[in-house]
Swiss-Prot record:
The species this protein was found in: Shewanella oneidensis (strain ATCC 700550 / JCM 31522 / CIP 106686 / LMG 19005 / NCIMB 14063 / MR-1)
Keywords: 4Fe-4S, Cytoplasm, Iron, Iron-sulfur, Metal-binding, S-adenosyl-L-methionine, Transferase
InterPro entries listed in its UniProt record: Aldolase_TIM (IPR013785), Elp3/MiaA/NifB-like_rSAM (IPR006638), Lipoyl_synth (IPR003698), rSAM (IPR007197)
Catalytic activity: [[Fe-S] cluster scaffold protein carrying a second [4Fe-4S](2+) cluster] + N(6)-octanoyl-L-lysyl-[protein] + 2 oxidized [2Fe-2S]-[ferredoxin] + 2 S-adenosyl-L-methionine + 4 H(+) = [[Fe-S] cluster scaffold protein] + N(6)-[(R)-dihydrolipoyl]-L-lysyl-[protein] + 4 Fe(3+) + 2 hydrogen sulfide + 2 5'-deoxyadenosine + 2 L-methionine + 2 reduced [2Fe-2S]-[ferredoxin]
Binding residue positions for [4Fe-4S] cluster 2: C94, C98, C101
Localization per record: Cytoplasm
Protein name: Lipoyl synthase
Amino acid sequence: MNRPERLQPGVKLRDAEKVSRIPVKIVPSERETMLRKPDWLRVKLPASNQRILDIKQALRANGLHSVCEEASCPNLAECFNHGTATFMILGAICTRRCPFCDVAHGRPLKPDEQEPVKLAQTIRDMKLKYVVITSVDRDDLRDGGAQHFADCIREIRKLNPEIKIEILVPDFRGRIDAALDILSTEPPDVFNHNLETAPMHYRKARPGANYQWSLDLLKRFKERHPNVPTKSGLMMGLGETNDEIAQVLRDLREHKVEMLTLGQYLQPSKFHLPVERYVSPAEFDELKALADELGFTHAACGPLVRSSYHADLQAQGKEVK
């Protein structure tokens, strides 16, 4: 029996290579079997690309990454033109192989010790008032990357004392207590962790993750920091029903989560999980009404909503769709 080839540090695996060894086999989609995108998913391109080019240049110059690019977000042009970006720390290689996600899998390099300072300087130069910091999963690190998050928050606040910082964290599998101890030294202004989908779809969509772990992470952070809003995001179109998503919303509220994002899953390539349905704007409106009824303080629900989509406006309590 041949052993799997050892991953080389820093080498990105994408598409078929990425999903070759996950519990549920991914059959590459054929064009004729893929659902046609409805009109409501058309993205308007900005009249000018200059702001987009400026942000990309700033990221490249400092060796930084944005999840907007690495995960092929459909809102990249809008957000970059709006002057916002979600920074992805700890490299651009993830230790997990989630087949809905376009971020590369592989064996990551050692964290860049200068990244927190470079990130803080870039944010200052971009004159941002609200930033979202996320990361790949780093199961190779003892603390799951929590110390690097804390270092980034500290350095950002040194150079940008008026800024608001939202962090979108991985699940810190097997090390929740250690991670939360570290983050308690530099708590963010908003704590975000995505459940992504309903629990019965975790095996195919989030191999290596656990629904209850994720709920516990959100609840335990809230218990330590009752004044910091907690937030989570979900995708639709992976085979779930509206009733299943409604139950997830109830679970989130039972675990004291206050902010919600709910959007449409879009298949990054034929090697990723297929879109099983396109959810209509009317259905998103119904789920938004349920979220409001359940007591979420902020709920952004719509086809193009993503976890950090207009996060600054949502944190201000403004309507986001």
